[in-house]
């Protein structure tokens, strides 16, 4: 039986990325030993879409009010890549991760199993 969803962020600066997850995003960690922190995330949903090109995986953070969330995270020092843009499925922006890379953040405008 599936009991959860585990995502991994590969980063060039795991210490800074872990601090960002804990201090900026407010996620609660557990010490898994060996320098590993694993963070409790919010409830998750999993979607399967047709691939454009090679099959791949993506991780998005979801929020209920993207403009308020962006303002809150910016006040905590988060940096965003570009502005909020409207997609057919919701409002989207991307967080810049301290260890390199980006993490999309969106306000869904589609039915969700989390709210249905």
Model segments located where?
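N-terminal beta-strand motif that seeds the catalytic metal site of vicinal oxygen chelate
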Residues: 1-18, 45, 57-59, 109-116
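Short secondary-structure junctions
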Residues: 25-32, 79-83
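Conserved short beta-strand elements that form part of the metal-binding/catalytic scaffold
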Residues: 27-57, 95, 102-109
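Vicinal oxygen chelate
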Residues: 4-12, 38-40, 51-116
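Conserved active-site tyrosine of GNAT-family acetyltransferases
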Residues: 17-22, 73, 100
């Amino acid at each position: 039986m599936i009991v959860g969803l585990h995502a991994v962020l590969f980063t060039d600066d795991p210490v800074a990325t872990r601090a960002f997850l804990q201090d900026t995003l407010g996620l609660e960690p557990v010490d898994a030993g060996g320098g590993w922190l694993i963070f409790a995330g919010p409830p998750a949903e999993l979607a399967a879409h047709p691939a454009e090109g090679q099959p791949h995986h993506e991780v998005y953070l979801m929020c209920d009010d993207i403009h308020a969330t962006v303002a809150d995270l910016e006040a905590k020092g988060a940096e965003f890549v570009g502005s909020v843009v409207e997609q057919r499925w919701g409002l989207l922006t991307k967080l810049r991760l301290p260890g390199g890379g980006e993490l999309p953040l969106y306000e869904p405008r589609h039915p969700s199993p989390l709210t249905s």
